[in-house]
Regions:
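N-terminal alpha-helical interaction modules that lie
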Residues: 1-84, 102, 107-139
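Solvent-exposed loop and edge beta-strand segments that line ligand/cofactor-binding
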Residues: 34-38, 89-94
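Start-of-helix signal in alpha-solenoid helical-repeat scaffolds, especially tetratricopeptide repeats
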Residues: 43, 92-95, 99
Length: 139
């Protein structure tokens, strides 16, 4: 029997590449601003900046940092084969920077009254991996 086969399970999870130098710098306690300046593609540095700004009540700065980390992560997801949907597992450490940036983007959007963006971010995070929504508190 010939014919097409269909994958009924959906797309494979997308795993972002390791960025060992940038990760090592953050893990060693380097200032996230320094890491972001030296490794501007590294979403985790932007997510760290966004989280710190949000916790300090600097919502607009948090939004800007988070948006940068989010867009840098989207670029990398696309290069890794992501088609705009499908799982982005929280358990894979390189994915966490993007997912954390997405969460802070949603939180900051909600705080400044961007309800539609808040809802989009919340849905995107949960669709990427429910564990990410749980870990970041954006549910």
């Amino acid at each position: 029997m010939g014919g097409m086969t269909h994958n009924l399970l959906g797309p494979e999870p997308t795993l972002l590449p390791e960025h060992t130098a940038a990760q090592a710098a953050l893990d060693a306690g380097s200032d996230p601003a320094t890491v972001a300046a030296e490794h501007p593609y590294y979403s985790e540095a932007w997510a760290s900046l966004a989280e710190k700004a949000f916790e300090a009540g600097e919502t607009v700065a948090a939004y800007a940092y988070a948006r940068t980390g989010y867009h840098r992560g989207l670029d990398q997801l696309r290069r890794a084969g992501w088609k705009g949907f499908g799982p982005v597992p929280w358990a894979h450490r390189p994915n966490q920077g993007f997912l954390r940036a997405l969460a802070v983007l949603g939180k900051a959007a909600g705080k400044i009254g961007e309800t539609e963006e808040y809802d989009r971010c919340r849905t995107f995070l949960a669709d990427s991996d429910p564990a990410a929504a749980e870990a970041t508190g954006l549910k």
